[in-house]
Amino acid sequence: GTCLIDEHMFDKDALIFDNGQITKAGITLPDGTPYVEISCEGFPNFGIWSAIGAPFVCLEPWMGRCDNTGYEGELSEKPNINALKPAEVFDKSYMISIK
């Protein structure tokens, strides 16, 4: 789908998408011409945000995210938390295309 970004869209914080809802996102110019696109298969969370008054928007694939309001559980119980053993490696990547 498409979403028009306006100056107040992030006044209450980031837009957060869970459960792998977003695998590709992009920004277009006002005339609809593609400007930038991010492909991010396999990331459980995706954030779209901007600082108030900032001249930019961030598109970020996340492997985890901040707590929901009122969360009081342990760090190890958070959704999508990754725990690595000593010397274990976790590798993940995404692609950004500038049009």
Give residue ranges: language-model regions.
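Active-site/ligand-binding surface loops and adjacent short beta/alpha elements
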Residues: G1-E41
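A general structural signal for short secondary-structure junctions and capping/turn motifs
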Residues: F17, I27-T28, I48-S50, K85-P86
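Glycine-rich active-site loops that engage anionic ligands at enzyme catalytic sites
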Residues: L29-G70
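Short alpha-helix capping/helix-loop boundary micro-motifs
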Residues: L75-I81
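Short Pro-Gly-centered flexible turn/kink motifs
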Residues: N82-I98
